[in-house]
Amino acid sequence: DLGYDFVLFADQDSIASEKVVDKLLENHQALKEASIKVGAVGTRAINRQTGLPYVEKSNEIRIIDKRVLSNTSNITECYSIMSSISLIPCKVFNIVGGFDESLFIDGVDNEWCWRAWHKCGLRSFIVEDAEIGHMLGEGDRFFFYKKVAIASPFRVYYQFRNYLWLCRRDYVPRYWKRKNGMKYFVKLFYFP
């Protein structure tokens, strides 16, 4: 124990305002005071090219009622959050364990959130007004009227490999297995 309360994760390519960490801390505290078991709080990623939020409806559980948490931001409970800029209490790692390093680059944050929920009942949240500029992959391409984030071949390899590894774990949600199975299959053949 080094005397720290939280670990702040930040990607090198995410752009945050000065107040993002304060918002994460404030909202974590409000969730805790409402007796909600918190695993992680994260930011709402905004696509730097389009200015639109990255939203995955199948990942979102519910918007937390403002009556439950007074003096907070809009908070969305999710099955998992991106670690691009996120905050996790140090003591939670003693309960859940660390990130699965064998996954290396893709799915690491998702797997940790799913494990925290399944094994420990710890929940993950997005603080909606804690926005960051972010870019998934190297840009977007359309595939049958749907935008698909394009990744380098190196990254696609790890996405597909990690998808296969994660499909074997019983705590990984079925919706994620179905959705990403199709997506990664298409990426293998359609995108360079």
Residue ranges and their predicted role:
Residues 4-15:
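Short beta-strand-to-loop acidic/aromatic patch adjacent to the donor-nucleotide binding site
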Residues 86, 92, 96-97, 102-130:
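A short, conserved alpha-helix in the catalytic core of glycosyltransferases
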Residues 127-147:
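Active-site donor/metal-binding and catalytic loop motifs
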